[in-house]
Amino acid sequence: MLFRSVPADWVVPMPKGMNLFEAMALGTAGYTAALAIVRMEANGLAPANGPVIVSGATGGVGSIAIDVLSRLGYRVVALTGKENEAGYLKKLGAGEVMSRKSLDLSKIKPLDKASWAGAVDNLGGEVLAWMASTMLPGGTIASIGLAASMNLNTSVAPFILRGVSLLGIDSGATPMPLRREVWRRLAGDMRPAHLEEMTRTLAFDDLPRAFDGLLKGAARGRIVVDLAA
């Protein structure tokens, strides 16, 4: 039997009602998506406030965020550069799929049409700046990733004229009580309804091909590696 000793604050007990496959399929992506939603709700986000937009929608964090938000009663808009995945995104719970190509990111206004009560951003850069300019008053953005850029060129207008909140989601430094609560909810009211559909199981020897797909931007959802296959 193989084992490794790690510091106690690195690990969280698997919650009751969750199996090993679900825990690995959720992984850091699922935890991060759920943490973002928990923090947004703590900041006042509720389904009645308006729709939530999710960028990087076909990725692991985006896919799980769409599924969980939909299950919690939110109207979800999926923002993607992969228009051919619209069917997949709607199956996860997106009420609308918006093409990233439809945005004119070269002319981002300090304030644009207010559209979103919440936003989960996996891209950074111009998309995050556009999101900030299009939030409803009192809206909340969860900044998770930098798949497009780690830079952010925006104005203070959304924050001081619409009261928009920008939350940074750091999944690696969450206090243990909050980590336990997030995982508890992932096994309960925030359990994704389509985890199996968004997850592929691969043998270890298949990983090089999967990595190639990731580098080409062709991957979607989650991958679980079966070391026994």
Task: Give each language-model segment a name.
Residues 94, 114-117, 159:
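Local beta-strand N-terminus motif with an aromatic residue
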Residues 177-229:
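C-terminal hydrophobic helical "lid"/dimerization subdomain
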Residues 103-114:
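Short amphipathic alpha-helix with an adjacent loop that forms part of the alpha/beta core around
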Residues 1-2:
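Short, small-residue-biased leader/transition segments that mark boundaries at the very start
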Residues 24-100:
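Mid-domain Rossmann-like dinucleotide-binding core that forms the NAD(H)/NADP(H) cofactor-binding site
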Residues 117-120, 142:
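N-terminal Rossmann-like NAD(P) cofactor-binding module of classical short-chain dehydrogenase/reductase
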Residues 126-192, 228:
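Glycine-rich phosphate-binding loop and adjacent beta-alpha segment
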Residues 5-13, 17:
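Structured surface patches comprising rigid loops and adjacent beta-strands/short helices at the edges
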